[in-house]
Amino acid sequence: MKIFHSFHDFKPKNKTIVTIGTFDGVHIGHKKIIDKLIQNASQNKCESLILTFFPHPRMVLQEESEIKLLNTIDEKTILLEKTGLDNLIIHPFDKAFSRLSAEEFVKNVLVDQLNIKKIIIGHDHRFGRNRTADIDDLIIYGQKYGFEVEQISAQEVNAVSVSSTKIRNAIIEGNITLANKYLGYPYFLTGTIIKGKQLGKTIGFPTANLRIEENYKLIPQNGVYIVQSFLNNNLVYGMMNIGMNPTVNGTSLSIEIHFLDF
């Protein structure tokens, strides 16, 4: 998979089959769209392409919301690479970009920059300034500028449509089992092991302290969890405790893992 950090850097040699979105979580609903994207690209001898954005648009447009995300940008990139995608564009999202009208976005980005043959979108996709345009507008622009449009229905689990918001809420509520079902894989954290107070060692339960660098990563609620971890490419099991530790300046989040038989 080729990675580009702006659509201006992408120089397509072939026509592209494109999908657009934030893809937070890369959940089973996203996978349904991506599978269709890759299938279409193969059938039409085109390149498959995802256009996503960072920061998340809500971080820019709703600064007070402090949204927490299911994936860091590195985690999302790894998950998308596993799908077999040809190209990933992570375009910087800012207020100037958000002011593009729907037609400006279609003409200047999809047509002129991405050399689009077809766009595949989810059931609730909206775009353009203030997210005013929808599938009907996209079909009209497709007819005007010469590309195809296909909309994918929602992926459902037990008659409930899967969304990143529902997964975030499940994690916040402590329902990791439901979140994992919607994701299609176990929810995970990535970080750096740092030296802690080493109190666990004194009672026979040495722990590793995990530091999460990105403050926008959604951390499950405080509690004890069974975890699988990859250490030096080895899969090990353990118990993870998430809680608050007293510090000089108050309290800080602590993520400690006791690895079993390691």
What role is predicted for each listed range?
Residues 7-72:
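N-terminal catalytic cores of NTP/NDP-binding nucleotidyl/phosphoryl-transfer enzymes
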Residues 68-76, 99-106:
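Glycine-rich, highly charged phosphate/nucleotide-binding loops
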